[in-house]
Regions:
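Structured segments of extracytoplasmic/periplasmic soluble domains
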Residues: 11-14, 18, 33, 46-53, ...
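Flexible coil segments in periplasmic/lumen-exposed cytochrome c-class electron-transfer proteins
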Residues: 72-142
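Gly/Gly-Pro-rich "capping" loops immediately C-terminal to redox-active cysteine motifs
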Residues: 21-56
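Extracytoplasmic/secreted proteins, especially bacterial periplasmic and envelope-associated proteins
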Residues: 3, 7, 25, 29, ...
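Non-catalytic, surface-exposed connector residues within folded enzymatic/regulatory domains
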Residues: 24, 60, 81-85
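Sequence/structural segment immediately N-terminal to covalent heme-attachment motifs in c-type
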Residues: 1-21, 39
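Internal catalytic or translocation cores that form aromatic/hydrophobic pockets or channels
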Residues: 55-65, 69-78
Length: 142
């Protein structure tokens, strides 16, 4: 069985970057930002129901490890205190209800507005709701 980091690198790193910093203006960074979504109940579900997550060819167990790696390792300080890890049962249920009938960009933009309005997230998360999703690179990412 592969480690969650290895699964991330194989399944997500090509678009979201090896350390969670995307090389594309159209793909959101995960590093120090993905955890903000866990301030909202729908945000937690959103992460587990994204089509590339829900339809991934990995097992529920591996996907649970992958989501927890993304949130707790890549999410850094953006993860709310007291956040519980995803459970196998939760991930199994979420991926059976994939987001397919909604605009993912509109849904993400709405959550970003709510998070910023409620002071759950820094304003650099606003980039998730704009055309240029990239956060400024940190020195260690350059």
């Amino acid at each position: 069985m592969q480690t969650p980091r290895a699964n991330y690198l194989l399944s997500c790193g090509g678009c979201h970057g090896l350390n969670g910093v995307s090389n594309s203006r159209l793909v959101p960074d995960l590093k120090d930002q993905v955890g903000f979504f866990l301030n909202l109940p729908e945000g937690r579900g959103y992460l587990g129901r994204l089509p590339n997550v829900a339809f991934s060819i990995t097992t529920d167990e591996a996907l649970t490890g992958l989501l927890n790696y993304m949130v707790f390792t890549l999410g850094g300080a953006s993860v709310p205190k007291g956040t519980k890890p995803y459970t196998l049962r939760e991930v199994s249920q979420l991926r059976r209800q994939p987001l397919t009938e909604v605009s993912l960009v509109q849904m993400r933009q709405h959550m970003v507005r709510v998070l910023i309005d409620q002071d759950h997230a820094t304003t650099n998360l606003r980039r998730y709701g704009e055309n240029d999703y990239r956060s400024p690179p940190s020195p260690q990412d350059q």
